[in-house]
Amino acid sequence: MINTFNPEVRLAIHDLDKVGPAIPLENYEAALRAILTGKASPVETASFLASLHLTKAEEVPDILMQTVQILKSYSTPIANIEMVSPRFVDIVGTGGDGHNTFNVSTASAIVAAGAGLWVCKHGNKASTSASGSADLLMSFGCDLLNVTPKNIVSITEQCKFSFLFAPMCHPTLKNVAPIRKQLGLPTIFNLVGPLLNPIPTYARIIGVSKLSLGEVVAKTLLKLGAGRSLVVCGEEGLDEISPAGPTHTWLVRDGTITHEVYTPESFHLQSHPLSSVASGTPSANAILLEELLSNMLHANHPILDYVLMNTAALLHVAGMAESLREGVKIAQQSISSGAALRELSNFSTISQQP
């Protein structure tokens, strides 16, 4: 345990107390690097993260951009992934919305892969919900600890859907994981997590849990030079495209940000209350996912429509579908043909190989 004061972290905490979001970026960087390399005490780390949250400094695009760049500088590199495909996509939410819905981003990623997109999802176990993306895939038999930056290239050569378990890619985050859990507050790491996929991403959907964060994350993506990106937030604070009502979206493309509101009618689908798409345990969600991918859910089933909406949006932002409604048709074909289920089964099998 660190018993001495860390001057960089103490200075940053002082800056946050005095000027909040106007903290000098060089002081912020020095403090974050000290924390990530284990040179700060748990109390200093907790104080720093809480100060970022309470002063809303964590919602400043320049600070978010710098955080992403610093974390990626410590991440495990992945070589030659562009030889597999130059157009990988991802769909992920920040989490922490409190609605505890079915793992729609994971299901949508699989359906999109069945439709022909190269999808490498980057995620973790649940922190606030009943079932995170990693929990769900592990319940389906995927050995995520066997999927590493060293073998992900060979895995993606064999299947269009793959998943990188975040702790395998960002070893320095182990220094803050227990502190984040004990702190009980959302931290800056919740916001930047969806931006840390080590696979170069051509197109993506990122869900945020507060409407005020939509433009913040969109501006951060713009500063990072990200490709086609759609930031989404359901009007009720859902970090996905909502099946219950309006969803605010911010499209980042060609150096601009365009705001638009989607509704279930935009997809030519029915609306459903969030209670009808609630999450179960990881094992229960795995059973439901298999039923979905086996084309066993009836037309207009809430979970099916929820997945179709989010998949269609990913297909649209990636350029595979010219419209949201065309995206729905492509997603339906991915499920009914069995292609989506084959992608998941293939990844599960390959992930278990020595």
From Swiss-Prot:
Write down the superkingdom of origin.
Eukaryota
Identify the Gene3D superfamilies for this entry.
Nucleoside phosphorylase/phosphoribosyltransferase catalytic domain (3.40.1030.10)
* Top EC class, one word: transferase
Question: What catalytic activity does the UniProt entry give for this protein?
Answer: N-(5-phospho-beta-D-ribosyl)anthranilate + diphosphate = 5-phospho-alpha-D-ribose 1-diphosphate + anthranilate
Cellular component GO terms, alphabetically?
Answer: cytosol; nucleus
Q: Which GO terms describe its biological process?
A: L-tryptophan biosynthetic process
The alphabetized UniProt keywords are: Amino-acid biosynthesis, Aromatic amino acid biosynthesis, Glycosyltransferase, Transferase, Tryptophan biosynthesis
Q: In which pathway does it act?
A: Amino-acid biosynthesis; L-tryptophan biosynthesis; L-tryptophan from chorismate: step 2/5
Give EC number(s), comma-separated: 2.4.2.18
Family matches, as Pfam families: Glycos_transf_3 (PF00591)
The answer to keyword Phosphoprotein applying to this record is no
One GO MF annotation is: anthranilate phosphoribosyltransferase activity
Question: Which protein family is it in?
Answer: Belongs to the anthranilate phosphoribosyltransferase family.
Its name, as the record gives it, is Anthranilate phosphoribosyltransferase
**Taxon lineage:** Eukaryota, Fungi, Dikarya, Ascomycota, Taphrinomycotina
Gene behind this chain?
Answer: trp4
